[in-house]
């Protein structure tokens, strides 16, 4: 399965949606 993960930080001006497979650590996916 693949999940859509939204990273939101108003203070940092970040609003990103990433695809994250269920066998990948979310921090590893966020680094890519």
Curated annotation (Swiss-Prot):
Residues 3-32 form the 2Fe-2S ferredoxin-type domain. Its main location: plastid. GO terms for molecular function: 2 iron, 2 sulfur cluster binding; metal ion binding. Binds 1 [2Fe-2S] cluster. GO terms for cellular component: chloroplast. It is found in: Plastid, Chloroplast. Keywords: 2Fe-2S, Chloroplast, Electron transport, Iron, Iron-sulfur, Metal-binding, Plastid, Transport. The keyword Membrane does not apply. The keyword Signal does not apply. Its cofactor is [2Fe-2S] cluster. Belongs to the 2Fe2S plant-type ferredoxin family. Ferredoxins are iron-sulfur proteins that transfer electrons in a wide variety of metabolic reactions. This is Ferredoxin. The lineage of its organism: Eukaryota, Rhodophyta, Bangiophyceae, Porphyridiales, Porphyridiaceae.
């Amino acid at each position: 399965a693949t999940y859509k993960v939204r990273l939101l930080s108003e203070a940092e001006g970040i609003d990103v949606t990433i695809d994250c497979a269920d066998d990948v650590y979310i921090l590893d996916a966020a680094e890519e």
